[in-house]
Amino acid sequence: LSHLYSETLLAPGLGASFQWRHQNNGRDLLGVIDPESPVYATLRQSIERFENTVFELSLNKPNLIEWANSQDTLQDAADIRELRLGGAHAFQQCIELLQTMQMMTDRVEDPVRISAIHHSIGDVMGFIGQRSGSVHYLEQAALSYEQALEIRTQDDMPLEWAHSTYNMALVIHIIGRLEDDTGMLKQALGSIHKAVALLPRDDDTDVWAAAMSSAGTVLYQLGTHRRGSRTLQQSLVAFRNVLTERTAEKNKIAWAITQNNLAATLQAMGEHEEDIGSLEASIPVYDSVLKVLDRDALPLIWAMVSANRVSAMYSLAAESDYLDMAETSVAGFDKISKLFDGTEYVTYQAKAAERMQQAKELVASLQV
């Protein structure tokens, strides 16, 4: 399953649309490019440089170049940003190369190749659109996938059809998130379900699990948007299915993403349904993620999961009138806020401070 898109790490603690790219399956994009091309080596390096990068999904960042130059974790070397800056240029060059290849390839003589080129253009356009928050690029990506699907029919090329259908669903999902359009989220979910049905779970469990995880994420977002307990239940089922394939032994990072998202869904159910049991169940799941994550290697991820855990404690304290837990959540949000001291993540720090104030108000109300 070739794509460059990141996976969502649900972050209710700080209210962020937090994205994390870890899969590195964009290397398949190189399959349609001549290894002798000067773009080939640069693109290969660029795909690797964007691996394990994180960002917040938001509309209309200035451009991919500026995004790449500003990316860091809480502690990141300046030369890494420069490497990613060069990588951003490479993706722009890749589009030009693929479009040239598209013009030079005859659809009738080589339909398989032209469909792969359309699909690859979609991947790069979609990557730039997701990173920069550009709906224009995302719409161009969707158009490229549609062109690929004119050739990759479900009957003639079922697996390729599933790949392009799934990637187009990811693009639609991103647009839906950026524009707060539940109709597009529903459309994305329908396409993901169709693709998952044709993806070979036994032959490639990683691909199947990634697609099922995407379904769980969209269900969560729909469920929290309309406060739908049934939809959140479906999200829980999806994430639990993913965890039958994603284990900490196989892939620690993928497992951690899924465990966090499972906990966030339990937390959402507890908050929306005033269900103390679900809130209580979410906290040890967050704990299990924090025990596995390397705080020094992934400080921003660790901070997000920690904020989620504290927010679950806050919600449980509010629902159960637990004064001690409310006081613990004050200290927890204060600790999260201080993690961002001296960093560029002022928005996250401000949100943590805001949540700390809410927790203080809860403490005051419980002391009456």
What is each stretch, according to the model?
Residues 53-66, 101-114, 131, 148-161, ...:
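Flexible helix-coil transition and linker loops at the boundaries of alpha-helical arrays
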